[in-house]
């Protein structure tokens, strides 16, 4: 399964929200430095969707706020 995620790093509030256009918005506290925000996004998706972190990967957008995520089901 593939989907688009918009990430808000360095956020005061942590949330996981589906927008009207179908894009997920994930806010994480970690900064967008050295992949910390990406790790937090994967962990957030893992907890929210109850999927092991090893099954989640970022296909594109490693250094961008807009990412395409793939989950192996």
Curated annotation (Swiss-Prot):
SUPFAM superfamilies: YggU-like (SSF69786). It holds the Pfam family DUF167. InterPro entries: DUF167, YggU-like_sf. SMART domains: DUF167. Coiled coil: none annotated. Belongs to the UPF0235 family. This is UPF0235 protein LA_1736. It comes from Leptospira interrogans serogroup Icterohaemorrhagiae serovar Lai (strain 56601).
């Amino acid at each position: 399964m593939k989907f688009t995620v918009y990430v808000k790093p360095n956020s005061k509030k942590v949330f996981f929200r589906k927008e009207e256009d179908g894009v997920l918005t994930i806010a994480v506290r970690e900064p967008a430095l050295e992949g910390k925000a990406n790790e937090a996004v994967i962990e957030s998706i893992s907890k929210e969707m109850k999927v092991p972190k090893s099954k989640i990967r970022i296909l594109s957008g490693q250094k961008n706020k807009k990412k395409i995520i793939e989950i192996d089901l």
